[in-house]
Amino acid sequence: FINCVITGSMPNEIMISDTTRSTPLKYSFDHCYLMSNPIHSPFIKNVLWGNTRDQLFVRSAINKDGYYDFRPTEESLLRKKADIQISRLPAFCFDMNDIYRLWENAPDIGAYQWPGK
């Protein structure tokens, strides 16, 4: 996972364990926001460890129409923390709303880029 957000209403949204021990667990997190207690692993780098008090999105609670709004706020911890090399790749230089990620030369973590004022 690169430039990803894994969050939710629980204080520990992700746990990594190999219960079978028969095949090595393969994973990697880089430039991500993880709602979890810190996990120490050589496969995890440049991660922001979250907590339930973090205000990341425009609306992280469902509205009356049944929708969330996962665009980052201007003050979001996700702002300007993505891996710029990955964000420069043609497949990732625009967000889910077709906003150019590199307009500030500092892309945001997650599926959406803060659009500016």
Predicted regions and their residues:
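Predominantly extracellular beta-rich ligand-binding scaffolds that present long acidic/polar faces
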Residues: 1-75
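Surface beta-loop-beta hairpin patches that serve as ligand-binding interfaces in beta-rich domains
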Residues: 75-117
